[in-house]
A protein has these predicted regions:
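Bacterial N-terminal signal peptides
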Residues: 8-19
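Boundary at the C-terminal end of the N-terminal hydrophobic targeting segment
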Residues: 21-25
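Beta-alpha junction/loop-to-helix N-cap segments that form part of ligand/metal-binding clefts
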Residues: 27, 42-49, 61-144, 154, ...
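Extracytoplasmic "Venus flytrap"
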Residues: 31-54, 79-84, 107, 181-190, ...
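Extracellular/periplasmic Venus flytrap/periplasmic-binding protein
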Residues: 86-89, 98, 140-141, 148-257, ...
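Periplasmic-binding protein-like
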Residues: 94-108, 125-135, 179-182, 233-243, ...
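Extracellular/periplasmic periplasmic-binding protein-like sensory domains
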Residues: 148, 250-324, 333-339, 392-418
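Solvent-exposed, acidic/polar segments of extracytosolic/periplasmic ligand-binding ectodomains
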Residues: 352, 356-419
Length: 419
């Protein structure tokens, strides 16, 4: 269905080998190691739907073409419970099942643990290597100071997202005071630091009214935080919160009648528009690699195909980069003629993928995908630019800034060791 261009492209004692040799027709398996239970289970379920959609698209097109013939892809779901420690347990389980490809993204802390483990374990076991594909963990260090040959990121990192948001904040002349509220882990701290830097460079007249972190996944009532924001006099909030930490935050803002804009990384996702309702119209700004109202016949066709496959309103959260990651992984396997993780990692380097509406390239230097970004504003469905709503809420997003792929790259500090 999709097309690609320029396809120039025993973990420790007692651990079993992850084999890359396949019998003809045997599935090539990808292990999704993600929090499928706990406070972010809804985010894990959304990831599974998107990856499964990508797997089904690849298989409908004939699967992965290796030297010995065509093979279907298979998604194997392993529950990390959102914990780095449990993620490493599931990494071992994937190895014991001879799975050479691992997907994860909902936590930069988990991603960092997986990268560190794979760096060591792949070095010790050159015949049982595993490759990590990352769809959402946005800590810039993962393709910077802590980059790895065994890791490729298919999402824009936090710095790239913040740069796009800053373009919109820079022209918001009503902006005077900003409150930074983020989850207390590496990604949340990155968002805070990047927001401070962006505002200092682009809007030095804007005051930081507060800079606060909260425990991730543990706050059930954000009312005290909303009270602090109100007391600070801030007219905008910048947050990288995601999952229930975002939904509960915006719900508290609506209930307390907070009259402030929200500049978010994920304000278009997982219940946030419904939680805000009319209170979010014109006040919630989000940034993403794609959204249903991006426009164009092929973009619309992708969205409608996803909704046909997952028609329930609560499942209406298509994330193009996630299904595209699976399609690019399959393209790299076909290019290499092999499901060997080393060959596939090399084939991914420099791989350009064009589906007709979201052309992207995997930068070889640091394994960071370069793709377009969209900054969007919440409004009622049916208003100009908002043909599709989110999750049956009656609210959707219109593009206020489209950043072409060639404008999104940022310098990298990656110094990669290659096998």
């Amino acid at each position: 269905m999709q097309q690609w261009k320029r396809c120039a492209v025993a973990l420790s004692a007692g651990w079993m080998l992850a084999s890359s040799a396949f019998a003809a027709g045997e599935p090539v398996r990808v292990a999704l190691i993600e929090g499928m239970s706990g406070p972010f289970a809804n985010a894990g379920a959304a990831v599974e739907r998107n990856l499964r959609f990508g797997v089904e698209q690849v298989n409908a097109a004939g699967g992965v073409k290796l030297r010995d013939g065509a093979h279907p892809l298979e998604l194997v779901v392993l529950d990390s419970k959102g914990s780095p420690e449990e993620a490493l347990v599931q990494l071992r389980a994937a190895a014991e099942r001879h799975i050479g490809f691992v997907a994860q993204g909902n936590s930069s802390a988990v991603a960092a643990a997986l990268v560190a483990a794979l760096d060591k374990l792949n070095a010790r076991n050159p015949d049982s290597r595993m490759l990590f594909v990352n769809y959402s963990a946005d800590d810039p260090a993962l393709t910077g100071a802590r980059c790895s040959f065994w890791h490729s990121r298919f999402d824009a990192h936090a710095g790239m997202r913040m740069a796009a948001l800053a373009d919109v904040m820079a022209r918001d002349r009503a902006l005077r005071k900003v409150y930074l509220l983020n989850q207390d882990y590496s990604f949340g701290h990155d968002v805070s630091t990047l927001a401070r830097q962006a505002l200092a460079e682009r809007r030095p007249d804007v005051t930081i009214a507060g800079d606060e972190f909260h425990p991730i996944g543990r706050i059930k009532d954000f009312s005290p935080y909303i009270a602090k924001i109100r007391a600070s006099g801030a007219d905008a909030v910048v947050t990288g919160n995601w999952g229930n930490d975002l939904t509960l935050l915006v719900k508290a803002a609506r209930e307390q009648g907070l009259n402030a804009k929200f500049y978010t990384f994920y304000g278009n996702s997982l219940g946030a528009p419904a939680a805000l309702g009319d209170a979010g119209v014109g006040r919630v700004i989000a940034v993403a690699d794609w959204h249903p109202n991006a426009g164009g016949a092929k973009s619309d066709a992708f969205y409608r195909a996803f909704r046909t496959r997952f028609p329930a309103a609560q499942d209406d959260y298509p994330v193009r980069r996630m299904s595209m990651m699976i399609e690019m992984l399959a393209a790299a396997m076909t290019r290499a003629g092999s499901a060997d993780p080393v060959a596939v990692a090399r084939a991914l380097e420099g791989l350009s993928f064009d589906d007709g509406f979201h052309a992207s390239t995997m930068r070889a230097q640091d394994h960071q995908l370069i793709q377009p970004l969209y900054v969007m504003e919440m409004d009622k469905a049916g208003t100009p630019g908002v043909r599709f709503d989110n999750e049956g809420s009656g609210y959707g997003f219109r593009t206020v800034l489209a950043v072409p792929a060639q404008r999104t790259p940022m310098p990298s500090t990656c110094s990669m060791t290659r096998p």
